[in-house]
Amino acid sequence: DDIIITTGGSEAVLFAFLSCLNPGDEIIVPEPAYANYMAFAISAGAVIRTVTTTIEEGFSLPKVEKFEELINERTKAILICNPNNPTGYLYTRREMNQIRDMVKKYDLYLFSDEVYREFIYTGSPYISACHLEGIEENVVLIDSVSKRYSECGIRIGALITKNKEVRNAVM
């Protein structure tokens, strides 16, 4: 019941934006990030606000204060790609909990693009946003089989959420 099949991960991102956001709403995204997020946001009338990660810090999640500097009444979501595209950075349990705490504190959506979850080479554990307690209704997970099977022409993706209102809006 929580899974909606889409024509690729890109359509899942667009559906997430269109179903959860209104024109002028803002999404905070750690950068560097997948370039097409911007196009999907524009299509939905939303605005991407970025918080910069640096190579010097290994592209780790910026401090919570950096996110909070950007949060305002128009902020409706945080978008992460885990592992990150293009850096490959894998968020730690501590970082995922920090994201969870911000989502909970400000009642935001967490759009979590997890299409690269099988591409982890460090031995570190992968933490899905769907496993973060206390924000189950806020999480919208994006998935795709294209990367997993090296078949980018196979346009099969999914939008996964426990939030019934979001699922109904998508359908």
Task: Label each residue range with its predicted role.
Residues 132-171:
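Conserved core segment of the aminotransferase class I/II
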Residues 37, 99, 129:
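Aromatic/hydrophobic pocket-lining residues that form π-stacking "cages" and hydrophobic walls in ligand
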Residues 1, 18-80, 93:
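PLP-dependent aminotransferase-like
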Residues 54-124:
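Active-site phosphate-binding strand-loop segment of PLP-dependent enzymes
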Residues 1-15:
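Short loop-beta-helix segment that forms the pyridoxal 5′-phosphate
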Residues 6, 51-52, 129, 142:
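Hydrophobic residues at beta-strand termini and immediately following loops
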Residues 25, 46, 105-109, 135-137:
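A short helix->loop->beta-strand "cap" motif at the edges of active sites that frequently abuts
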